[in-house]
Amino acid sequence: MQLLSSCYLFNGLSESQLLRLSAITKEEQMRKGHFLMHEGQVAEALFVLKEGFIELLTAVNDDFELPIAILRNPGDCSGTSSLVAPYEYSLSARCAEDGTLFVIQQADLKHLMLKDHELGCTIMKNLAQHLLERLKETRQELKIHFKTLFKSSHN
């Protein structure tokens, strides 16, 4: 339960809410090289890292995937596309080493969120804040790339 509380999605949940969340959470072993999800696939689960590394990838073309990030801290999560329409994973996730993760099925989490609106609002608020931070980071990266491109084209 403590690991779930370290996941940004579940910040601010009460102990009783975390207990209900842990009741729908399953611990699974992950093997190096195994894909947890594929970009464009129907998003059916949320994954919370317990131990190991998960590499997040996006397809550039048919034979090349670009690494976007590595989840390495206990409590890091992926699969938040399972909470937002159109419910398709926006990235692929591959286990970079053997480890353990918690899996929460989308249907179970949505049911819990509908039963406990406060829990649902907290999770969605945390998701919105996280996505806003990611948007800001992406905007900063674009500025850097644009400046570099602009400088190189004017030299």
Each language-model region and where it sits:
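Cyclic nucleotide-binding regulatory module and flanking cytosolic helices
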Residues: M1-E27, R31, S82, S153
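Cyclic nucleotide-binding regulatory domains
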Residues: H34-E97
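A small-molecule sensor/coupling module
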Residues: Y89-S90, D108-L149
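A short, charged helix-loop
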Residues: L101-F102, H111
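Helical coiled-coil/dimerization "stalks"
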Residues: L149-N155
